[in-house]
Amino acid sequence: MTINEITAISNSFTDEQASTSVVRYYVNECISKVNIEAKAKLPLFSSINDPTYTALSESWQNVLFVPYVCYSIKMNDGSLNEADRYITKFNENLAKLLQEKNSAIGESYREEDFTAIYRTDPTMGINVGWFTRRGNGGF
């Protein structure tokens, strides 16, 4: 998709007239959020005249970029209830992307720790009820 296409779809959904330069900013913010959450390095749009975006499939662009842009447009005009619906949809779709990120995001767009698994020690957080640390070994 191009910025012009994303702008047209988003304006149609929101019944607003956001400019392509504003939409480019919103799309880049969306891509940055995806990059942070997925440990990816998807490229940003550098101008409104950039060619068709190919780092994600058009399906993923439709379910991520469009709801996020619609959310941003509605936040800008103060329609908080509508904005909330769009951000909920974006978050649901982002969660799906994160579950399927190995097939959705190409290897050339992955950070070093893209598939890292972090282990935690759950015993370090026990400090409630019977397990309260009272200086007597937890008893």
Predicted features by range, described:
Residues 1-56, 103-139:
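Conserved short "hinge" loops at termini or chain/domain junctions
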Residues 43-46, 82-87:
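Short, glycine/acidic-rich hinge or "gate" loops at secondary-structure transitions
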